[in-house]
UniProtKB/Swiss-Prot annotation:
Location of this chain's protein in the cell: Secreted
Protein name per the record: Brevinin-2SN4
Main function: Antimicrobial peptide. Active against a variety of Gram-negative and Gram-positive bacterial strains. Not active against fungi. Shows very weak hemolytic activity against human erythrocytes.
Tissue-by-tissue expression: Expressed by the skin glands.
InterPro entries, A to Z: Antimicrobial_frog_2, Frog_antimicrobial_propeptide
Domain of life where this protein originates: Eukaryota
Propeptide: 23-40
One cellular component term from this protein's GO annotations in UniProt: extracellular region
Extent of the signal sequence: 1-22
Family designation: Belongs to the frog skin active peptide (FSAP) family. Brevinin subfamily.
Keywords assigned: Amphibian defense peptide, Antibiotic, Antimicrobial, Cleavage on pair of basic residues, Cytolysis, Disulfide bond, Hemolysis, Secreted, Signal
NADP listed as a keyword: no
Chief location category: secreted
Length: 72
């Protein structure tokens, strides 16, 4: 259970950072009078999500390899 708390906490932390960045960016767009297109929103979030998923996957694979080989 403890091993699952760390990745979940990391995902929560990264989510909060991305939300604050989006709010800052939204505030800057409102000042300029321009709007972001849906494609820009999706692209930025998709890249962040891919990076987080990749890191979490690599960490889980490394943990599994460590447990299976007994080199922990």
């Amino acid at each position: 259970m403890f091993t699952m708390k760390k990745p979940m906490l990391l995902l929560f932390f990264l989510g909060m950072i991305s939300m604050s960045l989006c709010q800052d960016e939204r505030g800057a767009d409102e000042d300029d009078g321009g709007e972001m297109t849906e494609e820009e929103k999706r692209g930025a979030f998709g890249d962040l999500l891919k990076g987080v998923a990749k890191e979490a996957g690599l960490k889980l694979l490394n943990m599994a390899q460590c447990k299976l080989s007994g080199n922990c």
